[in-house]
Swiss-Prot record:
It catalyses: tRNA(Arg) + L-arginine + ATP = L-arginyl-tRNA(Arg) + AMP + diphosphate. This is Arginine--tRNA ligase. Signal peptide: none annotated. The lineage of its organism: Bacteria, Pseudomonadati, Pseudomonadota, Gammaproteobacteria, Legionellales. It holds the Pfam family Arg_tRNA_synt_N. Keywords: Aminoacyl-tRNA synthetase, ATP-binding, Cytoplasm, Ligase, Nucleotide-binding, Protein biosynthesis. Monomer. One of its GO terms (biological process) is arginyl-tRNA aminoacylation. It is an enzyme of class 6 (ligase). Its EC number is 6.1.1.19. CDD domains: Anticodon_Ia_Arg, ArgRS_core. InterPro entries: aa-tRNA-synth_I_CS, Arg-tRNA-ligase, Arg-tRNA-synth_N, Arg-tRNA-synth_N_sf, ArgRS_core, DALR_anticod-bd, Rossmann-like_a/b/a_fold, tRNAsynth_Ia_anticodon-bd. HAMAP family: Arg_tRNA_synth (MF_00123).
Amino acid sequence: MIDLSTMKQQIETLLNQAIERLKTKGVLKPEVTPVIKITHTTDPQHGDFATNLALTLSKAAGMSPHALAEKIVEALPPSGQITEVEIAGPGFINFFVTEGSYQTVVSSILKAGKDYGRSEMGKGQRVHMEYVSANPTGPLHVGHGRGAAYGACVANLLNAAGFEVHREYYVNDAGRQMGILALSVWVRYLQGYEASIELPKNAYQGEYIIDIAEALKAKYGKQFYHSVESIQAKIPEEIDSNADPEAYLDVWVTAQKDLLGPKDFECVFQAALDSILNDIKNDLEEFGVTYDDWFPESRLVREGLIQEGLDLLTKHGYVYEKNGAQWFRATALGDEKDRVLIRKNGLPTYFAADVAYHLHKFNQGYDQIIDIFGADHHGYIPRIRGFLKGLGKAPEKLHILLVQFAILYRGNEKVSMSTRGGTFVTLRELRHEVGNDAARFFYIMRKPDQHLDFDLELAKSQSNENPVYYIQYAHARICSVFRQLKTTQKNWDRPRGMENLSLLSTNYEKELLATLGRYPEVIKRAAMNYAPHLLAHYLQTLANQFHTYYNAERFLIEDDNLRNARLNLINAVQQIIRNGLTLLGVSAPEEM
């Protein structure tokens, strides 16, 4: 059994042995430590693998790269898997492997099935992943969808590479935005009784707020009703809603709490939170994005985690008091300015909550911690690394991945996505329009830090230009071949096909075999680099090669040996497409 990663390891071993021989001969000094990089060639005429080792060591050897390449090739031990080694260009070394090496890939794939490509590279290391974590103040919009698809794919890839992944959603159920949400629902509730009351312009405006308010009214009647006069009595006249709309909102929230009292305010607050959070959970689950835990911010206070973080920073000398507030000495750890932890009113800041939450993550003993943020959080990275140092934790365990928001276009018109304004396109609306598969694939087919203009028309099209359709169509085409087989008198003998894989000699077949052999390496690279787009691009290449093969050759032929070999080959292609799409959260339909 063989895969591309094994071949690369074998070639690396051969090169290391050659280098040691050259050291013994005095061509290279004993202290020379080579960094061997082996790549898969893009042109079969240049072999299957290549290395630039001679170019990187030529200075140390005191000779031209080409001359050193000749000596390296001369020093290579023989290998039964290598048929030819050639020197190309200024000193690249190209390796040609035996056809049998690639043909065994088919048997490996068909034997392993859905587990082909999985590895123990991660050795069971525990990884904590947090992604999406959108405030539960409204439905998820199309921007959140990219973080959801990306995070879910990275988690799947790490799991396939042998890591134990814990998926978590941090629920911001405390803080100012949640107070504004409760206020927005309450005002809409009051409008059911008092048409004259106006919703503050910076409150949440969406139709979903009205839906929550109507449900509240249906269940509780006038329990939360207060007259316009009683509310206005709580609003100081000097507060101008137009001059300072945010301060005006805060006064409204305070008035709501005073009038309702703790019990009724909590009832309104919880109704709003539960409604939106349940909607988010359902939306993500329908999108194929699931979590092991939904961690509420309120738990940080309830379990004393904020105080624990504050105590630890204080112990290490990074907390001081100024103007009645407690500050984190962030500038001592590389940040641009110090940060408030506890306000003078005694309430913790968002920053204090982040300190506590990350302390909690580190206390769980994970080997890696991954935060996936929107690109607008770029400036937050040095703050997090700073307070981790202040807590005495190892910042190198934390990996912060930034995802650019996707921009949705209808024709040439860019769609606004303002949550408070209520004029946004939800993730659910996008999914219903283009389908889960297109949404999942389009979100991850580019690097996460690249801007993504989501082309709605392309995502819906059934054409070769639509990458997810093109890949799924390859899978469906293979399924159709096997359905057609059942209508003929011909059979499919797998063992006989394995015995005759050497008959797969066309360029189309050689290309497919080589690409199939790369799959395990692609999974490892995509996992280690948190790069699901690498898998997406690989599947596009594989699908393109299959479609070319399908259009050029026939499969249900009279020659039993060649027919069985070809059916085994396309069955392996079918399996890899299905495996890869599954990791990306995309279905592999049997008919299209």
